Amino acid sequence: MAVLPDKEKLLRNFLRCANWEEKYLYIIELGQRLPELRDEGRSPQNSIQGCQSQVWIVMRQNAQGIIELQGDSDAAIVKGLIAVVFILYDQMMPQDIVNFDVRPWFEKMALTQHLTPSRSQGLEAMIRAIRAKAAALS
């Protein structure tokens, strides 16, 4: 994974933002830190349905059984949301991802209240897809 903060630092940084404009800029910055997804990652099987923007998420399991995620979007804010989700699932095994509830983190960040309905639905679609892929590996 790129140089992204851990869960706790993400939350601290997010809460330090003075207003939602700063928070959106921070989310976009996180998306810019994601490594570039190569063309082969932008395949139909990695495409996430239910997002208005184009979203691709690639999931691999490393030799230690830990899930490694890569992703991209054609929308800057959505790419940032991908980074937020990846931070929350960082260093997890498939069963950990299946069992982990991201909603309390989103509530602490007041994230879903400030997203448009279509972005909230897209975020949910990303989480469902990651959890489904993780369930298939566990």
From Swiss-Prot:
Keywords per UniProt: Cytoplasm
Gene3D superfamilies the record matches: 3.90.1010.10
Main location: cytoplasm
Cystine crosslinks: none
InterPro entries in alphabetical order: Cysteine_desulfuration_SufE (IPR023939), Fe-S_metab-assoc_dom (IPR003808)
GO annotation terms (biological process): iron-sulfur cluster assembly; sulfur compound metabolic process
One matching Pfam family: SufE
Intracellular or extracellular location(s): Cytoplasm
Listed pathway(s): Cofactor biosynthesis; iron-sulfur cluster biosynthesis
Entry annotation: catalytic residues: 51
Highest taxon above the source species: Bacteria
Gene Ontology cellular component annotations, sorted alphabetically: cytoplasm
Family affiliation: Belongs to the SufE family.
Reported function: Participates in cysteine desulfuration mediated by SufS. Cysteine desulfuration mobilizes sulfur from L-cysteine to yield L-alanine and constitutes an essential step in sulfur metabolism for biosynthesis of a variety of sulfur-containing biomolecules. Functions as a sulfur acceptor for SufS, by mediating the direct transfer of the sulfur atom from the S-sulfanylcysteine of SufS, an intermediate product of cysteine desulfuration process.
The protein's assembly and partners: Homodimer. Interacts with SufS.
Entries under HAMAP family matching the protein: SufE
Protein's UniProt name: Cysteine desulfuration protein SufE
Organism for this UniProt entry: Shigella dysenteriae serotype 1 (strain Sd197)
